Amino acid sequence: MATINDNYLKLKAGYLFPEIARRVNAFAEANPDAKIIRLGIGDVTEPLPAACRSAMIQAVEEMGDRSSFKGYGPEQGYAWLREKIATQDFQARGADVDAAEIFISDGSKCDTGNILDIFGDNNIIAVTDPVYPVYVDTNVMAGHTGAANEKGEFEGLVYLPVTAENNFTAEIPSQKVDLIYLCFPNNPTGATATKEHLQAWVDYAKAHNSIIFFDAAYESYITDPSLPHSIYEIEGAREVAIEFRSFSKNAGFTGTRCALTVVPKTLKAKAADGSDVELWKLWNRRQSTKFNGVSYIVQRGAEAVYSEAGQAQVKALVSFYLDNAKIIREKLTAAGLSVYGGVNAPYVWVKTPNGLSSWDFFDQLLQTVNVVGTPGSGFGAAGEGYFRVSAFNSRENVEEAMKRITEKFKL
């Protein structure tokens, strides 16, 4: 009989968001008249920018003409998109990133998991707690951990608590770690990192020959000019960091699928024989073997983000969600709840009232006011007693949800 990858059996019963969906669906079936407002999973609600739609429509027409039809594209992405990303997203901010170091993909979630393909099994891996569950679960699947304890922490991972006491920014570990996951603006807490904070991480990584996985999926929500958008704005980062970005949350591509990963050609790691190997070459080989590239139509849509009209439309879209976050933050604060994030980030991190556990608060919100959020404990043990509220919804729904919550849970 064929055998399985037993590492999957170590995973907790359900990935966080499917478990939320299961509970919501069960409630909806039992209460078909309930008007449920979903502020849980970070999926966008507003239409694609007009510039992106127009570019994609034009690309579809091109695919209908033999002279302009496109078949397989380059696995790394089309040069015209990579050049615009390098110029406008990185070089314009003083970050030294070349177009050849950018790999276009169908999602940063995929890339943060797939990147493990090019790393060995004996690395010491550090994650923040709470953390985006994909970072942990993909390492479990890859066999990089032992079993989970009663708190859900996996043996073999180094957990770096982020709490109100440290402003939800992890402290540099006292021990040596090899791979470090950082996400700023942070999912789920909405925390941001200063240049000084990221410089400390880069210095640590250089001193210990570590690699930082920097998830910048929400960088477009940064409005404070003093905050870095890319880790490559930090001196020395090209020697220690891989950055992941996405078009999902700035241009609404959650259903369209386009993202990018930056692997500097100066970034190296050790082979078993002790030699230094360029990670760019390994990632390029991995993508060329396992990935056929993002569709031409979608990449033309992503390219339109960098047009004058596209930039204005994306800015308006991000501002819309930031205004939602401001409403959530202000209303919940006025109700007496302890609230974090929601500034320079689309997520608001809320302390649950009256000592409720994260899942108990989830159930109460769902059952009493028909509002869905995300239990903090689903992001890790240190998230227990917290709750994530997403700004990704219509203005009408956000205002109605806040009205319901504040009337029910005002302290």
UniProtKB/Swiss-Prot annotation:
This protein's cofactor list reads: pyridoxal 5'-phosphate
Q: Which reaction equation describes what this protein catalyses?
A: (2S,6S)-2,6-diaminopimelate + 2-oxoglutarate = (S)-2,3,4,5-tetrahydrodipicolinate + L-glutamate + H2O + H(+)
Superkingdom of this protein's organism: Bacteria
Q: Which UniProt keywords apply?
A: Aminotransferase, Pyridoxal phosphate, Transferase
Which residues are noted in the entry as substrate-binding? Y15, G42, K109, Y132, N187, N292, R388
Could you say which residues bind pyridoxal 5'-phosphate here? Answer: Y72, S108, K109, Y132, N187, Y218, S246, F247, S248, R257, N292
Q: Which GO terms describe its molecular function?
A: L,L-diaminopimelate aminotransferase activity; pyridoxal phosphate binding
Q: Which Pfam families match?
A: Aminotran_1_2
In the record, the note on similarity to other proteins reads: Belongs to the class-I pyridoxal-phosphate-dependent aminotransferase family. LL-diaminopimelate aminotransferase subfamily.
Q: How does it assemble?
A: Homodimer.
Q: What does this protein do?
A: Involved in the synthesis of meso-diaminopimelate (m-DAP or DL-DAP), required for both lysine and peptidoglycan biosynthesis. Catalyzes the direct conversion of tetrahydrodipicolinate to LL-diaminopimelate.
Checking NCBIfam families in the record gives:
DAPAT_plant
The name of this protein is LL-diaminopimelate aminotransferase 1
Gene giving rise to this polypeptide: dapL1
